[in-house]
């Protein structure tokens, strides 16, 4: 057996599918501002920067369907479709821009 290395990651062989089986919502997003906007993987998308133009009701309780720790950058004038997935667990959103601060489904 090989010696253990602190912090080493040993993934299963093959490919791993992120967020497998999670429902996906695709929305169109435009940056109507004059500065770039970056949104992280676990940010409550409905509360993203006001310069981003999209259906915020459709984005309620959802986050970007991208690997953890990454982000998407929207340059001024950018238009693109993004995939969102629902928050799991207790489905509570606390902080961010303070628009919910409680249960998502209330």
Swiss-Prot record:
Reaction(s) catalysed by this chain's protein: urea + 2 H2O + H(+) = hydrogencarbonate + 2 NH4(+)
GO biological process: urea catabolic process
SUPFAM superfamilies to which the protein is assigned, alphabetical: Urease, beta-subunit
EC number(s) reported in the record: 3.5.1.5
Main location per the UniProt record: cytoplasm
Lineage top rank: taxon: Bacteria
Keyword Hydrolase assigned: yes
PANTHER family (alphabetical): UREASE (PTHR33569:SF1)
Stated name of the protein: Urease subunit beta
Name of the gene encoding the protein in the UniProt record: ureB
